[in-house]
């Protein structure tokens, strides 16, 4: 996979409608493939019903210490909100 700019990555991430009551697996698939294309090892932890997953990645040597970056993939529903632009596209 081609290396993307930070803007391109953000645009891709925002494009996934990972509303909290829906699956996030399409987004997880993309992030995992992107990381794996740079030989970054990943593993998933699935929800009980397998509709969602958390993705873990490890960069660098497996030594004690380091930095943990954490985030989430779910967003609040957009229905009924007065958006002036598409909420799934960067503006």
Residue ranges and their predicted role:
Residues 1-67:
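N-terminal, positively charged, Ser/Thr/Ala/Gly-biased leader segments
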Residues 68-91:
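Active-site metal-coordination/substrate-binding segment of hydrolases
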